[in-house]
């Protein structure tokens, strides 16, 4: 039983260990490899027992260990001894320890390799970090140095700009002072011209007074006192003029000396600056060329080195990137092996634990404790429990073997934990190394990118600097060539100037001869004037008319000469403008060619820049080399920037010098041309004077024959005037265009004052001589202008008093405008300086921004270079992983190569630093020289400025004195004008009575006069739009003439006002004489100032003065252009007026003929007086004429071209101006009539207002009368009541009387009653006070008190009868008074109604008059249309004449254009000379040949002009046609007579209206005295209404007539309503009176019946 039972037990036991073995093996594999281990983990190999055992996989090794342990055991394990098991366990433990040691060795090897990789990575990262830090430090240093250099450059630029701005300000101040002086001179010239005109007018007035005094002496009414006063005034004026002349000459001499000193100082300063600039430019150009050559060599050497270093560094970087990649791969593999080993260890530990547990269990079972169950194998094999082995069994129950086993397991477990910790730390190290590698790669990549970008930017900058230096070299060469050309041109100009000197000497001789001839001519003219005065006293009115026409012809001839001179000046301006335009075009072409060359060079430079950029991108890959090169390049860049700035400044200076030289050459050519033209003009003027003298002698004999031919040639002259105006317009347009071109050129010329070379002294001498010639020409022109002004002054008349006042105001306004313009010019220049400073600041800011951008771009390029280097470094790390063994050798070699390169770069840096220091020293020396020169210049300029300021202060003092005198003159003129206005207001107050009958007519005239006033204001305000305003004035004149024709019959009474106007004119003459004295003083002062200015101008020999004289010429041309425009507009206006006068105003001109004759007589008297004054002033004029003769001798040759056309234009314009003067006289007369009409208008408007006030007063009176009627009616009602009461009382009295009589005579039986019942008495006594209270006005008239009915006797009754009689008498008186008042009120109503009817009649007449005026306006508009048709036909005829003149002008223009084309061709040749620098000799010869050709062409042109003069001689016969204008004058006289008749009739009507108004005023005063208290409110209200209506009428004048008509209609309606009310009131009064009478009769009848009963 026991055996049987034991066998199954054994079988179960044997099966259980087999199953447990498989599970234990599986669990060991799971614990070592983990259940989810991959195939690769399970394929891990482990060496078997012994050193030479082959590696086997971990699962197989586990099975081998388990199989070996099982094979060593005997088949009966139950009986084995514990010692054998312990030995096996120890062996297995030893095997496991060996495996653990082997794994530890592997781990140590892996950790060693990992440490080695980590150390290598650290070394590489440290190297990269060191390189990055070095590159960053180098970049920072380069940036700091660059910023420092930029700051230094900016500081130098600012200093240079400040100096340049200082010089510019000095130059601007000098220019401003010169411009102010010029403006002051011009203003003084204008004032002198105005003063001379006023002096001449005053001389004419003095001559008229002398003639009048002579007549009065001949008639026995001489006034010696007036003559003595006049002579004393003339002597005072002469002394004042002499003093003013001396003072002005003295002041101008001082000013001239000061200006000459300043000019010399400026000239020397400019010369010093020019020499310094030239020296600095030459030295800097040479040094820059050498530096550029050195830099080019260094750059080529550096480029080669950079190429070699780039290749080596690229190879190293690729190797290092490979090494890095290999290391990363190895690290990954090692991490994998470590993870596999870790799993193996875990599996082995688990297997050992399981085996130990099984052995412990088996040993325990063998020791005889089978009942004690084992712990579940799951708990033993769980890894969590494996971490806590002491919990398996208590230590008390285990034997020492088990304890040893447990200790071994614990040791393995601890070792395993240590290994796990080491693995974790190694993985963390690997991750950190990978992150460091990635960061180092990124940093390397960024550093490579930055270095590449910086290298590219530096290459670009280097190329740009090279291009700039090359461009500057070219510009320097061009400037040198231009200087050479200018020197040659200067020599040619000197030759031309010498020739001109000879011509000028000849012209001076001719001028002296002409002066003598002019003096003789003046003497002959004076003798002729005296003869004319004698003949004027003897001849009749026809001879006087002929003399006036002769004077006008002389004036026309003078104007023709003035126009000729103006045309010549205009042509000179045109020629100068063409020359300047050609010069500008040549300069533009040169600039275009230079720009084309610059563009080509820029294209080449761009190609070079691109190539160098591509090379530079390749040259910047090494970090160490880049650091040193960056330093060198930054320093080189700063040095090159400084050099570039200096070269740019020098280039600008050279350009400015070239421009100034070219402009001076052009100006010299222009001045030569102008001098030639002036010579020709002077010759032509001399010939013109000779011919004028001949014509004067001929005209004196042919005046009567020419008077008949003037009318025929009128139309031809008008057409010719139209053609002349067209030509003038064309010339004006050309002038405007030339002026614009000249202004544009002046802007460029103003910038040329900074650079002057050594040629300026000689050129200044030549210019001084030319300026002397030009001044002589200008003096001659001014003297001729003065002569013209003196001749034109004979045209002044009595009606020019207001014009003189307005002229004075205009002169003052012009002075204020000139001062305002000067202020504006100063403000503009200040603004320009500010704008220039702002532009410079903007440029500096842009430069700084550009530099910042460049720095940023360099930084970006450096970052890109670093990034590219980082990429390359990654590749190098990958290569390092592949080539681990050769890395140390290559690194050593590379270090050696890098050291060599660094040493070489350091040597280069030292060399470049030495060169840079040398360049800096040179630059500093140059800067010091330049600063010293600039300081000297600034000092000199400050001295010149101080002198100029003193001069300016003196001038300002003189100007202030002149202004004070002008203000004093203006105040006196204003006071005189106020006196004249007071006299005029006194006369106008006498004419205020004209308002009653001419309301509508004067409103129409008021509209016309307001339109004229507005047009005149527009003329004064808008001088540029003269033609349209002239047309408007013509239309208004036609309207005024038509209005005068319509009012011809009504204006017969104007003769009386005319006498008043004559008195006012005499007073105005006196005021004008006073003003003339003051103006003479100012004229003398201005003439002396002008003389001193001319002397000052003669001594100014600088370039600035020539420029100012050109500006003066431009101003003269502008003034001439404005004068031409004004004369053209005046001629157009005169033509229109002539056509209108020829169409519609013939009858009026016939009427005005008589007045024209009288005016002719007055003009003759004035001419006589003017000749007397002219004889006194002849001595002063002789000197001026001598100078004029000299100028004419100089201008004689040039005037041959234009003489024929000028004569023709002069004749045409003279005829037009003569007729225009006549029309101006007619205009003046019409203006005088307009003034009278305005006075009448004002008076009529006042009368209208008075009439409206009268109407309102009448209406108020009517209202008062109505109120009075109502009060009378009330009084009548009260009187009726009182009468009824009285009648009742009378009835009662009668009854009492009858009763009393009856008692005495008939009825003794009557009761002795009282006379009235007490009841009645009480009633009556009670009623009467009530009545009295209701009618207080009746109380004074009824003083009775009714007696009480006391019983009495006969005496009381008699007393009652007496009182009744008194009461009746009072009542009758009151009734009579009421009737009288009623009759008076009726009479007043009748008078008021009659006055209202008269006012209505007047309104009706005014309305009819308005209708007549409207008809007249319509007829005037029709006449205007007819005139427009006639004008269109006249324009067509004038167009034909224009074509003839145009053909002649075209021939002249063709010659001028040929000359201009030849000049242009010469300028083109000059440009070719500029471009061909090497062929200077041939070009100089060509210039000489071209000068000869020019002289030949000028001679040809003179011959052509002479031919043109011969062809234009028939046109001179046009002068004979001016005599036809006398017929127009006769017609004007007839029309004036008609106007006088109409004025007489108008005066008569005005007198009648005045008488009527006086009567009305007397009646109104009588009525107003009765009703003043009640009418005050109504009149005040009505006056306010009228004031508002008047303001509204002034605000809306076209609606004035409608408003007046509506007001009149409302007045009529009101009057009608009042009349109707009065009539109704009358009817009511009559009805009430009748009713009351009937009622009274009825009551009386009833009382009678009652008493009878």
UniProtKB/Swiss-Prot annotation:
The keyword Coiled coil applies. Keywords: Coiled coil. Residues 1-17, 1304-1335 have a biased composition (Polar residues). It comes from the Eukaryota. One of its GO terms (cellular component) is centriole. Residues 38-50 have a biased composition (Basic and acidic residues). It holds the Pfam family Rootletin. InterPro entries: Rootletin-like_CC (IPR055167). Residues 86-145, 310-351, 423-1215, 1361-1570 form a coiled coil. Residues 1-57, 367-396, 1302-1356 are annotated as: Disordered. Belongs to the rootletin family. This is Ciliary rootlet coiled-coil protein 2. The gene is CROCC2.
């Amino acid at each position: 039983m026991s055996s049987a039972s034991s066998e199954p037990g054994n079988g179960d036991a044997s099966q259980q260990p087999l199953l447990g073995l498989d599970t234990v093996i599986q669990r060991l594999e799971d614990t070592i490899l983990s259940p989810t281990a991959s195939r690769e983990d399970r394929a891990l190999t482990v060496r078997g027992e012994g050193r030479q055992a082959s590696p086997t996989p971990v699962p197989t090794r586990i099975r081998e260990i388990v199989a070996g342990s099982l094979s060593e055991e005997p088949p009966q394990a139950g009986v084995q001894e514990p010692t054998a098991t312990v030995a096996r366990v120890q062996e297995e433990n030893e095997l496991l320890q060996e495996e653990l040691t082997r794994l530890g060795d592997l781990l140590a090897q892996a950790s060693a390799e990992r440490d080695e990789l980590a150390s290598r990575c650290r070394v590489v990262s440290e190297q990269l970090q060191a390189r990055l830090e070095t590159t960053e430090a180098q970049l920072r240093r380069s940036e700091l140095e660059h910023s420092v250099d930029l700051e230094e450059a900016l500081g130098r630029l600012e200093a240079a700009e400040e100096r340049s701005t200082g010089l510019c300000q000095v130059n601007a101040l000098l220019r401003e002072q010169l411009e102010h002086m010029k403006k002051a001179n011009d203003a003084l010239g204008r004032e002198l011209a105005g003063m001379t005109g006023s002096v001449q007018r005053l001389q004419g007035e003095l001559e008229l007074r002398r003639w009048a005094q002579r007549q009065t002496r001949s008639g026995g009414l001489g006034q010696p006192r007036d003559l003595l006063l006049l002579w004393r005034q003339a002597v005072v004026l002469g002394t004042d003029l002499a003093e003013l002349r001396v003072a002005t000459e003295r002041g101008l001499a001082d000013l001239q000396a000061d200006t000459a000193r300043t000019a010399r100082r400026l000239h020397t300063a400019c010369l010093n600056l020019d020499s310094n600039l030239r020296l600095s430019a030459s030295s800097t150009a040479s040094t820059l060329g050498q530096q550029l050559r050195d830099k080019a060599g260094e750059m080529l050497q550096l480029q080669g080195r950079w190429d070699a270093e780039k290749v080596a560094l690229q190879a190293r970087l690729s190797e290092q990137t490979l090494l890095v990649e290999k290391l990363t791969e190895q690290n990954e593999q090692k991490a994998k092996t470590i993870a596999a080993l870790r799993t193996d260890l875990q599996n082995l530990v688990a297997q050992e634990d399981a085996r130990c547990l099984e052995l412990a269990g088996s040993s325990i079972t063998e020791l005889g404790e089978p009942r004690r169950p084992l712990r579940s194998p799951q708990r033993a094999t769980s890894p969590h429990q494996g971490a806590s082995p002491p919990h398996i069994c208590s230590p008390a129950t285990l034997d020492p073997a088990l304890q040893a086993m447990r200790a071994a397991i614990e040791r393995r477990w601890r070792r395993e934990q240590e290994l796990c910790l080491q693995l974790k730390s190694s993985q963390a190290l690997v991750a950190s190394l990978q992150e460091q590698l990635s960061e180092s790669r990124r940093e390397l990549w960024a550093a490579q990118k930055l270095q590449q970008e910086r290298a590219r930017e530096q290459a670009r900058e280097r190329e740009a600097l090279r291009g700039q230096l090359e461009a500057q070299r070219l510009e320097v060469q061009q400037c040198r060539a231009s200087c050479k050309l200018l020197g040659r041109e200067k020599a040619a100009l000197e030759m031309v100037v010498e020739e001109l000197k000879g011509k000028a000497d000849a012209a001076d001789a001719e001028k002296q001869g002409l002066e003598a001839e002019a003096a003789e001519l003046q003497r002959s003219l004076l003798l002729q004037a005296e003869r004319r005065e004698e003949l004027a006293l003897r001849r009749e009115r026809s001879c006087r008319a002929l003399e006036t026409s002769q004077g006008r012809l002389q004036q026309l001839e003078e104007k023709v000469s003035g126009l000729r001179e103006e045309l010549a000046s205009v042509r000179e301006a045109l020629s100068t403008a063409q020359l300047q335009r050609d010069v500008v075009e040549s300069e533009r072409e040169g600039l275009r060619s230079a720009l084309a060359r610059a563009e080509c060079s820029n294209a080449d430079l761009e190609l070079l820049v691109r190539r160098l950029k591509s090379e530079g991108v390749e040259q910047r890959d090494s970090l160490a080399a880049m650091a040193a090169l960056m330093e060198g390049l930054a320093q080189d860049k700063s040095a090159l920037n400084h050099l570039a700035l200096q070269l740019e400044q020098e280039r600008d200076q050279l350009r400015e010098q070239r421009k100034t030289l070219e402009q001076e050459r052009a100006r010299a050519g222009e001045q030569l041309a102008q001098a030639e033209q002036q010579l020709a003009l002077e010759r032509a003027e001399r010939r013109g004077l000779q011919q004028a003298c001949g014509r004067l002698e001929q005209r004196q004999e042919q005046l009567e024959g020419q008077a008949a031919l003037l009318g025929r040639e009128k139309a031809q002259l008008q057409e010719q005037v139209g053609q002349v105006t067209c030509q003038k317009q064309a010339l004006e347009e050309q002038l405007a265009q030339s002026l614009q071109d000249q202004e544009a050129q002046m802007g460029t010329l103003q910038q040329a004052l900074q650079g002057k070379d050594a040629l300026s002294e000689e050129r200044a001498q030549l210019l001084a001589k030319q300026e002397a010639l030009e001044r002589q020409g200008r003096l001659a022109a001014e003297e001729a202008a003065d002569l013209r002004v003196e001749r034109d002054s004979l045209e002044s008349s009595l009606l020019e008093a207001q014009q003189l006042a307005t002229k004075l105001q205009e002169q003052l306004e012009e002075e204020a405008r000139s001062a305002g313009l000067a202020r504006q010019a100063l403000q503009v220049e200040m603004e320009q300086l500010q704008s220039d400073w702002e532009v410079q600041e903007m440029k500096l800011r842009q430069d700084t921004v550009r530099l910042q951008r460049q720095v940023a771009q360099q930084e970006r390029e450096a970052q890109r270079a670093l990034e590219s280097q980082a990429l390359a470094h990654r590749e190098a790390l990958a290569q390092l992983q592949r080539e681990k063994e050769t890395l140390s050798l290559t690194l050593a070699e590379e270090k050696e190569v890098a050291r060599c390169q660094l040493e070489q770069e350091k040597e280069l840096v030292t060399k470049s630093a030495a060169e840079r220091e040398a360049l800096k020293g040179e630059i500093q020396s140059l800067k010091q020289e330049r600063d010293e020169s600039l300081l000297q210049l600034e000092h000199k300029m400050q001295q010149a400025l101080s002198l100029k300021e003193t001069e300016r202060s003196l001038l300002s003092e003189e100007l202030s004195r002149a202004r004070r005198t002008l203000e004093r003159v203006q105040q006196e003129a204003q006071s005189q004008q106020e006196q004249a206005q007071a006299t005029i207001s006194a006369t106008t107050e006498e004419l205020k009575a004209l308002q009653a009958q001419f309301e509508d007519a004067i409103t129409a005239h008021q509209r016309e006069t307001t339109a004229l006033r507005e047009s005149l204001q527009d003329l004064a305000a808008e001088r540029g739009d003269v033609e349209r305003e002239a047309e408007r004035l013509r239309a208004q004149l036609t309207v005024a003439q038509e209005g005068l024709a319509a009012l011809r019959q009504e204006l017969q009474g104007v003769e009386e006002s005319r006498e008043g106007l004559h008195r006012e004119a005499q007073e105005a003459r006196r005021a004008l004489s006073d003003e003339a004295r003051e103006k003479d003083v100012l004229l003398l002062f201005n003439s002396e100032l002008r003389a001193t200015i001319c002397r000052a101008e003669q001594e100014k020999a600088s370039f600035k003065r020539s420029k100012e004289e050109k500006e003066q010429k431009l101003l003269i041309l502008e003034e001439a252009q404005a004068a031409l425009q004004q004369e053209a507009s005046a001629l157009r206006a005169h033509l229109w007026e002539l056509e209108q006068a020829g169409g519609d105003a013939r009858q009026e001109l016939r009427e005005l003929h008589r007045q024209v004759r009288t005016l002719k007589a007055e003009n003759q008297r004035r001419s006589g007086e003017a000749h007397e004054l002219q004889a006194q002033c002849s001595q002063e004029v002789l000197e001026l004429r001598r100078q004029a003769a000299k100028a004419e001798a100089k201008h004689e040759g040039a005037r041959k071209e234009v003489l024929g056309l000028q004569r023709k234009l002069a004749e045409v314009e003279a005829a037009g101006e003569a007729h225009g003067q006549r029309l101006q006289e007619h205009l003046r007369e019409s203006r005088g009539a307009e003034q009278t009409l305005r006075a009448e208008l004002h008076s009529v408007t006042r009368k209208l207002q008075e009439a409206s006030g009268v109407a309102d007063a009448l209406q108020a009176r009517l209202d008062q009368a109505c109120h009075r009627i109502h009060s009378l009616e009330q009084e009548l009602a009260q009187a009726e009541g009182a009468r009824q009461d009285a009648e009742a009382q009378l009835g009662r009295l009668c009854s009492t009387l009858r009763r009393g009589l009856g008692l005495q005579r008939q009825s003794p039986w009557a009761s002795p009653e009282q006379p009235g019942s007490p009841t009645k008495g009480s009633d009556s006594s009670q009623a009467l006070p009530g009545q009295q209270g209701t009618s207080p006005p009746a109380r004074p008239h009824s003083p009775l008190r009714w007696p009480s009915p006391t019983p009495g006797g006969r005496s009381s009754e008699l007393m009652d009868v007496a009182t009744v009689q008194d009461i009746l008498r009072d009542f009758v008186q009151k009734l009579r008074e009421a009737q009288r008042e009623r009759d008076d009120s009726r009479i007043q109503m009748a008078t008021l109604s009659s006055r209202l009817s008269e006012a209505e009649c007047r309104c009706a007449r005014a309305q009819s008059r308005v209708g007549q005026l409207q008809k007249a306006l319509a007829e005037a508009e029709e006449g205007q249309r007819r005139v427009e048709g006639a004008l269109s036909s006249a324009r067509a005829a004038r167009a034909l004449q224009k074509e003839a003149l145009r053909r002649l002008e075209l021939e002249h223009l063709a010659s001028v254009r040929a000359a201009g084309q030849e000049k242009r061709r010469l300028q083109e040749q000059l440009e070719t000379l500029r471009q061909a620098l090497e062929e200077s000799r041939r070009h100089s010869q060509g210039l000489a040949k071209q000068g000869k050709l020019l002289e030949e062409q000028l001679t040809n042109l003179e011959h052509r002009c002479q031919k043109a003069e011969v062809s234009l001689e028939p046109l001179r016969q046009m002068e004979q046609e001016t005599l036809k204008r006398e017929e127009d004058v006769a017609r004007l006289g007839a029309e004036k007579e008609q106007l006088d008749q109409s004025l007489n009739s108008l005066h008569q009507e005005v007198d009648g209206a005045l008488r009527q108004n006086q009567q009305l005023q007397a009646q109104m005063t009588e009525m107003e005295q009765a009703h003043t208290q009640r009418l005050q409110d109504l009149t005040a209200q009505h006056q306010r209404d009228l004031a508002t209506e008047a303001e509204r009428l002034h605000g809306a004048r076209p609606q004035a007539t409608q408003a007046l008509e509506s007001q009149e209609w409302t007045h009529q309606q009101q009057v009608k309503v009042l009349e109707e009310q009065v009539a109704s009131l009358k009817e009511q009064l009559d009805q009430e009176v009748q009713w009351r009478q009937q009622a009274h009769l009825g009551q009386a009848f009833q009382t009678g019946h009652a008493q009878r009963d």
